[in-house]
């Protein structure tokens, strides 16, 4: 299959989460088109990403349409193996094997030949959400309020609900205590074994 390289540079700014980063990557890969292709992430920006951060990105391969998304093995990978209790002999074996097979990555690694290369400076990633209907429709958090208001009356489609102005004033009475309207936030337990939105990176939880 075609292999698309995705070069990561820089580092995320404080307060920007792995989810924000992943939504930006999904947006870029959807725009480029990676259906039926592999995506390999590389670049000096990898060093700033923990293994859970990388897993968050790889886990979203169905959302950006690729057959798979993966990261080469590096020192962070080995550190995670040690953290998870692997024996040093096992860690050394993984390193030796990956170096021999060309799966190892560090700052001295030559760039491979890819079908195409995309590039993202992680310092440019902004806090964001996606939707209202598709994960690749990323919206900066600073624009979310206006985007939400416009999506209510926009024609039905990927980013619209087709409501009339009169619909916006309608509300739903829940029991005898709560009056819900468009835009109200309701907290519910919606769980999944694998979705990004219910399986955040530890970085997201800590922040």
Question: Where are the model-predicted features located?
Answer:
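Mobile "lid/hinge" segments at catalytic clefts and subdomain interfaces of large enzymes
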Residues: 1-90, 194
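Active-site lining segments that contact anionic ligands and/or coordinate catalytic metals
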Residues: 3, 36, 115-117, 136, ...
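Generic recognition of flexible, low-complexity loop/linker segments
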Residues: 27-29, 46, 105-109, 117, ...
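Terminal amphipathic helices with adjacent charged low-complexity linkers/tails
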Residues: 49-55, 62-153, 157
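Non-catalytic terminal/interface segments that mediate subunit docking, oligomerization
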Residues: 123-199
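Single conserved hydrophobic/aromatic residue that forms the stacking wall/gate
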Residues: 197-207
């Amino acid at each position: 299959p075609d292999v698309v390289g995705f070069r990561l540079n820089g580092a995320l700014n404080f307060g920007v989460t792995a989810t924000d980063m992943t939504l930006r990557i999904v947006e870029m890969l959807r725009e480029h088109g990676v259906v039926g292709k592999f995506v390999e992430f590389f670049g000096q920006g990898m060093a700033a990403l923990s293994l859970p951060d990388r897993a968050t990105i790889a886990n979203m391969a169905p959302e950006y349409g690729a057959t798979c998304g993966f990261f080469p093995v590096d020192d962070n990978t080995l550190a995670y193996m040690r953290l998870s209790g692997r024996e040093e002999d096992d860690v050394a074996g993984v390193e030796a094997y990956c170096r021999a097979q060309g799966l190892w990555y560090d700052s001295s690694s030559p760039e491979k030949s890819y079908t195409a290369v995309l590039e993202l400076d992680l310092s440019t990633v902004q806090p964001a959400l996606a939707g209202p209907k598709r994960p690749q429709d990323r919206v900066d958090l600073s624009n979310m309020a206006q985007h939400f208001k416009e999506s209510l009356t926009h024609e039905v489609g990927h980013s619209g609900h087709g409501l009339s102005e009169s619909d916006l004033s309608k509300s739903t009475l829940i029991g005898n205590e709560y009056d819900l309207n468009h835009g109200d936030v309701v907290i519910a337990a919606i769980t999944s074994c694998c979705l990004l939105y219910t399986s955040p990176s530890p970085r997201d939880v800590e922040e």
